[in-house]
Amino acid sequence: MKNQLILTAASVGALSGCTQQENRPKDLNVIYILADDLGYGDLGCYGQTKIHTPNIDRLAAEGMLFTQHYAGCTVSAPSRSALMTGQHTGHTPIRGNKGGTGDDGVEGQHPIPADTYTLGKMFRQAGYVTGTFGKWGLGSPGSEGDPTYQGFDEFFGYNCQALAHKYYPTHLWHNREKMLLDGNDLAHTTQYSHDIIQERTLDFIRRNKERKFFAFLAYTLPHAELLVPEDEIIEAYRGRFEEKPYAAKSGDYSPEGKHPIHYCSQPEPRTSFAAMVTRLDRYAVSYTHLTLPTKA
């Protein structure tokens, strides 16, 4: 992860279009969306014109647009640790992408310590139900850095950030339980991970709409590998970009040659990237369509 961009820190007030201080509810639901390897120049609200992001652009127009909301580091784990703890990169306990890669059953990164004060713990202490969905990367399943031990009532997604770069993985995690994805073996593309994560996120919001909640949505999109379902989103971009096909490098495949270890070949990298950004935009609008009341 070279760059991170926060798409929106959305609250009930923002989603409902409230602009007057007196009209805002006392306790706001908070939805924090984090994208991976998305530059500010990839969004329409910052002047980009080739990739469609109408829903994110609308959130920016009706809310607040930041120009100095920086990633904490140049790679995933320490950057996420800085965000989760509020600490400068020089003080946060995670200094690099150390840990497993998913090979040979080893999964997950070096854990943040048990006594770390995280956003999840802060919101839980304030009476919020908390959930995180997508990419974690701050401690392997069952370790002290496991999200369910770091203030989150519910987690669904990739525990290991190395595996999070596969959009058709063999499994995801629900809390500390591994959920196998039938039909996926890294070479076959049956269940697109982020569509599943999106549905679980919406389910969390619906189940908790009568309570105040904090949802941290850490998407991998549009980080490589550049891979999306064959649907109307990618079809809309075909033929619009000059392409330079990406070929998987020698050694990027498992010894038996059955699946790519790193990134798969992609004949349409620019088309695929654009479709990934627009897919993220589609996900974002889902939250604005939900009614999210809080108790008085």
Report the location of each language-model feature:
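Sec-dependent signal peptide recognition
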Residues: K2-T8
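C-terminal motif of bacterial Sec signal peptides marking the signal peptidase cleavage site
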Residues: S16-G17
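Active-site-proximal cap/lid insertion segments
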Residues: R24-L28, A35-I51, R58, T67, ...
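Hydrophobic beta-strand core positions in alpha/beta domains
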Residues: Y32-L34, T132
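A short, Lys/Arg-enriched amphipathic alpha-helix followed by its capping loop at the start of a domain
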Residues: P54-E62, L119-M122, A126
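Catalytic-site neighborhoods of secreted/periplasmic enzymes
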Residues: A82-A187
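A short, hydrophobic C-terminal helix/tail in secreted or cell-surface proteins
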Residues: T291-A296
